[in-house]
Amino acid sequence: MARYDNIAEFESDLNGKGLRVGIVMSRFNQDVCEGLLSACTEELQKLGVSPELIRIATVPGALEIPLVLQKMGQSGKFDALIALGAVIRGETYHFELVSNEMGAGITRIGLDTGIPIANGVLTTEDDDQALARMQEKGSDCARAAVEMANLLKVLQ
């Protein structure tokens, strides 16, 4: 543990060796989602996660992501989970509904299962914003998943 102002700090790292990672990706706004997935899996492998220990499930849209995350989390087969998708504002209230319900579901499942979930579902005003953010967000999710899986192991 590191020390910060004489307080012991739990340390985590970004070593993904041996970690089992599940990814749930929406197929809606597929170009953006595939960009997120590419960046995410590339970063996971850079961090040492073996491709053989990465499992991907695709779902029709963002609202279907939480259910599959829940099943993966309950399976005991994963150290961390990642949600990938893109909800892009349209002309109706549907954007808020999908974004809020999906986000709340992901948070609840992480708390209920005790499995860390990196939320990589972009919520943007337009396609250009989503395309501009997909690479960085995909990589960020990979790092967050690995760091949180390792932190939870330290806390056990």
Curated annotation (Swiss-Prot):
The keyword Transferase applies. Gene3D superfamilies: Lumazine/riboflavin synthase. SUPFAM superfamilies: Lumazine synthase. Pathway: Cofactor biosynthesis; riboflavin biosynthesis; riboflavin from 2-hydroxy-3-oxobutyl phosphate and 5-amino-6-(D-ribitylamino)uracil: step 1/2. One of its GO terms (cellular component) is riboflavin synthase complex. InterPro entries: LS, LS/RS, LS/RS_sf. Catalyzes the formation of 6,7-dimethyl-8-ribityllumazine by condensation of 5-amino-6-(D-ribitylamino)uracil with 3,4-dihydroxy-2-butanone 4-phosphate. This is the penultimate step in the biosynthesis of riboflavin. PANTHER family: 6,7-DIMETHYL-8-RIBITYLLUMAZINE SYNTHASE, 6,7-DIMETHYL-8-RIBITYLLUMAZINE SYNTHASE DMRL SYNTHASE LUMAZINE SYNTHASE. This is 6,7-dimethyl-8-ribityllumazine synthase.
